[in-house]
Regions:
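Hydrophobic/tyrosine-rich beta-strand signature of extracellular beta-sandwich/beta-rich modules
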Residues: 54-56
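C-terminal edge strands of extracellular/lumenal beta-sandwich accessory domains
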Residues: 60, 123-134, 159-190
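Short acidic/polar micro-motifs centered on Gly/Asp/Asn
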Residues: 15-34
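Low-complexity, Pro/Ser/Thr- and charge-rich linker/hinge segments at domain boundaries
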Residues: 72-93, 189-190
Length: 190
């Protein structure tokens, strides 16, 4: 009896409890011994809705699982200063795990027409286009006075694919400052 108890204690020390996670993005499970750590950090590379399985294994080898829904959204800030030919801002709204598509993306775009000369500055006409594989899906234009700032805020529902934001100077001074702020957003219900 005494030997059996001692052997059991040795087994439990060598094979203690452990815990881990299955990230839900195709990676292998991440497991650690509870003696070595009390938490596991997971980093996701791509936006999406992930079903993460957290699990614990006791000293007798019994496993308990709990599924946790994790929502990873993406925020991108794109800047160009003193440009006469703004570059295309390209992003992919496809989820990184082949899961449900985003609810929408929100674009806040700011264009500044800096005042080069305090008197006799020029206006600039700009046009924004949101382009997907089917062509232009949204567009807007604005005349921005010398030293002024123009804004465009738009939503695009159910986006799934690569999108491009084109900003074109249609008329006026050559140099502008650009800031695109983009959020890829998922709904709570998936």
């Amino acid at each position: 009896q005494l030997q059996s108890s001692a052997a059991s204690d040795v087994y439990k020390r060598q094979h203690g409890s452990s815990f881990g996670v299955v990230p839900g993005d195709g990676r292998e499970p991440i497991t650690t011994d509870s003696v070595d750590a009390t938490e596991i950090a997971i980093e996701f590379t791509f936006h999406g809705l992930y079903s993460v399985t957290a699990f614990g294994i006791d000293q007798e080898g019994h496993r308990e699982d709990q599924v946790i829904e994790v929502m990873i959204e993406q925020h991108i800030d794109w800047y160009e200063n003193d440009t006469g030919t703004p570059e295309e801002f390209v992003f992919d709204s496809t989820p990184g795990n082949e899961g449900p598509i985003p609810s929408h993306f929100l674009l806040n775009s700011t264009v500044q027409n800096p005042s080069i000369i305090d008197f006799d500055g020029r206006d600039v006409d700009v046009r924004w286009d949101v382009v997907n594989q089917e062509g232009v899906c949204q567009t807007a234009g604005e005349n921005i006075g010398n030293g002024d700032t123009g804004f465009w805020k738009t939503l695009h529902f159910g986006p799934l694919s690569v999108h491009e934001i084109h900003l074109v100077i249609e008329d006026g001074q050559d140099r502008i400052d650009v800031h695109h702020s983009l959020e890829i957003i998922y709904s709570e219900s998936g």
